[in-house]
Regions:
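Short secondary-structure transition hinges
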Residues: 90, 96-136, 144
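Helix-turn-helix
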Residues: 2-4, 15, 19-57, 61, ...
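Amphipathic, non-transmembrane alpha-helical scaffold segments
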Residues: 17, 59, 63, 67, ...
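N-terminal intrinsically disordered/low-complexity leader segments
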Residues: 1-11, 199-202
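Hydrophobic alpha-helical connector segments
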Residues: 61, 75-102, 156-160, 200
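Hydrophobic/aromatic-rich alpha-helical bundle segments in the mid-to-C-terminal region
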Residues: 106-114, 121, 125, 143-189, ...
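An amphipathic alpha-helix signature
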Residues: 17, 89, 93, 132, ...
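Short amphipathic alpha-helical elements of helix-turn-helix/winged-helix folds
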Residues: 19-23, 94, 98, 163
């Protein structure tokens, strides 16, 4: 009985988040009210507040959902069986394309994510840490196989994600879209070259 209740509550939370995301995309997060979400779900605003204690909590849940989709896809790539350099190229490219699609392709969602980053939400910090950890997993595989040469995998992963800011960070992706700079492929080539073992000098 307890398990059924817990499942029902989890389902309701998920419905609230999915509905909030839909409204954020349609009318924007600033114009969306808890009453709007409740009306679409055919429940009272008080019932929504049973699951989320504030509108900010709903914002964070939507952000977590969007970021979680990127993390899930990135993790799947990290655990593929291809060579580490092939996986890292695919991983960095995929993160860029997913972020561009989710956060810059939709202006209303972009505004919410921009606010989350500017206000330093914990969900954003946790997401960046998880993405860095996923990148570190691939670099570690490469270091063990001799494909990459790095004495500090954690530092290498942080360096890579920092180098990819132009292609990872939602605001920077939008701001730099029409500005001169390296292409995604050129940046990934640079990262892979930086991680590759140095040939001995002749």
């Amino acid at each position: 009985m307890v398990m059924i209740a817990e499942t029902s509550e989890a389902d309701t939370r998920e419905r609230v988040v999915a509905t909030a995301e839909r409204l954020f995309r349609e009318i924007g997060y600033q114009k969306t009210t808890v009453a709007d979400i409740a009306r679409l779900l055919r429940m009272s605003p008080a019932n929504v507040y049973r699951f989320f204690d504030s509108k900010r909590a709903i914002y964070e849940a939507v952000a977590t959902r969007l970021m979680g989709e990127v993390e899930t896809a990135a993790t799947a790539i990290a655990f593929e069986t291809d060579a580490p350099d092939t996986r890292l190229r695919r991983l960095l490219s995929a993160i860029h394309h997913m972020n561009a699609e989710r956060y810059t392709g939709d202006e209303k969602i972009h505004h919410m994510v921009a606010m989350a980053i500017e206000e330093d939400w914990e969900v954003c910090n946790a997401h960046f840490e998880r993405i860095t950890g996923i990148v570190a997993k691939v670099i570690d595989d490469g270091a063990r196989q001799g494909v990459f040469a790095t004495p500090d995998v954690s530092l290498a992963a942080m360096t890579v994600t920092t180098a990819m800011t132009r292609f990872f960070h939602p605001q920077v992706i939008a701001q730099c879209a029409a500005k001169p700079g390296p292409s995604l492929d050129q940046m990934v080539d640079f990262v892979l070259a930086a991680l590759s073992p140095r040939l001995p000098a002749r």
